[in-house]
Structures are given as C-alpha cells and as structure tokens.
C-alpha cells in the first residue's frame, strides 16, 4: 500500500502543487497480509481548501497481474478538504493502464465522526484521460455543495470488467448538494462492460446549462445473463433546465433486465414540485448490437 502526496496540511489550505507520476516500473499486484491492493495519489489533502493542484500520470500504473478483492483500489485525488473550496484542480492521464479499479476525484466528500463534510465549491476542475485501459472499474467523481464549469474528457478509454460480484460499476458523476451548472462530460472512443454504468450531472436544487457529449462509444454487459444498468442524464435535479445531451454513434449491448437503460438530457426527482424544461437531445447513430 502506497500513498503519494504533493501537499498536505491539517489546519489550513494547500494550493498550487503538482504531482508528476511517470513510473519506470509499474506497481506490483501481489498477495499480501492485508488481502487487498490499494494505492493513492493526492494532489493535495487539507482541512480548509485545496485549489490549483495538478496530477499528471504517464506510463502503466500497475503490472498486468489481476487482484480479486472488493477492497482493491487505485485512488487519484486532485483535492480533498473538509471545508473551503476545491477549485481549479486537474488530473491528466495519458498512455497508461491499471489492473486495479481506478477512482478519480477532483473534489470529494469526507466522512469524519459519522458526518459527511463537503467542499463549499468544486468549480473549474478538469479530468482528461487519453489512451487508458482499466481492467477493473473506472470512476470519476466530483462532489461539493456547488459544482460549476467542471470538464471531464475521455478519448480512447476502456473500462474492462469481468462478471464477478466485486464489479462496482464504471461511472462519471458530478454531484452537488445545491447547484451543478455549466459542467461538461465529453466521451469519445470509449467502451465499458461494467454491470453499472452511470454518467450523471446532478444536484438537489438546480442542474442547468450542463452538457454530455457521447461519440463512438460502446456500453456492454459482462454478465452471462446480459443484465446491467446504464444511466446517462445531463441534468438530474428538482429544477433541471437548459441541459444538452449529444449522442453520435452509441452502441448498446443487449440489456435483458427491465428498466435498465435511462438516457435523457434531464430528469427530475420524485418531488411533486420538481420541474424540467428547455432541455435538448441530439441523436445520431444509436443502436443495439
């Protein structure tokens, strides 16, 4: 188990740090007394704010050996804070692979003394992944009280899983307690066969002016039963408006379970006063295979 930090402070802010990872020899996946493999890369860890931090990753992260524990994880955390802002943090991954499930956070909630702590804001953060393969799950997550102008880009990315019961799904989720506005998820040349695929921009009070772009993408199901869940929603909220979903050449495997595919520019919660309006779907080449 390894933890790498570009910066850390337990009573204040940590800003403007860069962590460059270019391994000459990938991290080994091995049996050990813990019974699992878990490694973490932190741009910053602080209590009152993490801003303008960058993680750059090149070359393979792990050996090609497969580990099979539900606790396995490779965590890439651009910014983690108990309060304050988590803005302008960036993660770049190029020409790499991992046989551990990969979890990427530009900002994340923290559990302390059975209480959840969220950054006040997660704005103008960026994740860019190019030429990358995860042989387990791949998840990118942004969590804050407010989240705006965040961008997540995939280009030539694979999330390859088996049909085991440790499949936790592959997801991109931007989630805000209050508002999530002007965020973009742009996926190109991507494939995933995770049991649970979720690509969501969501907030409790308002999700507006968000955009999800899907180009040349395949979603499949590793299970022999051909059962899984796929959700693509650009604005999930009690007030979702002016969101856009653009689909160009999306291929779906056979999902045999009912109520398994949800694709929409906007969706509302079950509250009677929830509303959704001025949302747009552009679709070209959408088919089952």
Label the model's feature ranges:
Residues 1-30, 36-260, 264-289:
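Surface-exposed loop/turn motifs in large extracellular/passenger domains
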